[in-house]
């Protein structure tokens, strides 16, 4: 009788362990950013914020919530509000704030973050 209880218990534990699943999240592969090639703000960085992908400009527009991320004002806004830290680029708020609790839908992709980080490391030029 005791053996059947042990077998039953082992079978139940086996079923319970098989019921648990975990979906592995595949990490995004980063295309290497060549630090010797200048990253252009106007064509590579600004579109991340001004395109409709994250809908940043639905709130962050002229007369709306700061910073003003419209095409004409995005560079000045990022600098005026000190969202770019050229001393410690990885600590720049422009990298750490999107994706926070108040902006959970706006998480930058790993490749976008890497591109912005490299641009800041290159001096965050308005080119």
Residue spans for each PLM region:
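Aromatic- and Gly/Pro-enriched helix-to-coil junctions and flexible linker segments
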Residues: 20-127
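Sec-dependent bacterial lipoprotein signal peptides
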Residues: 1-20
């Amino acid at each position: 009788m005791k053996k059947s209880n042990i077998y039953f218990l082992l079978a139940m534990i086996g079923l319970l362990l098989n019921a648990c699943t975990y979906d592995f999240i595949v990490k995004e592969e980063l295309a290497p950013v060549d630090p010797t090639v200048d990253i252009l703000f106007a064509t590579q960085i600004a579109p991340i914020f001004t395109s409709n992908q994250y809908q940043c400009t639905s709130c962050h527009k002229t007369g709306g919530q700061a910073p003003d991320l419209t095409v004409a004002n995005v560079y000045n806004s990022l600098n005026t509000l000190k969202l770019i830290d050229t001393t410690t680029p990885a600590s720049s708020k422009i990298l750490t704030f999107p994706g926070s609790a108040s902006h959970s839908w706006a998480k930058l992709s790993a490749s976008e973050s890497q591109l912005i980080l490299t641009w800041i490391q290159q001096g965050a030029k308005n080119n």
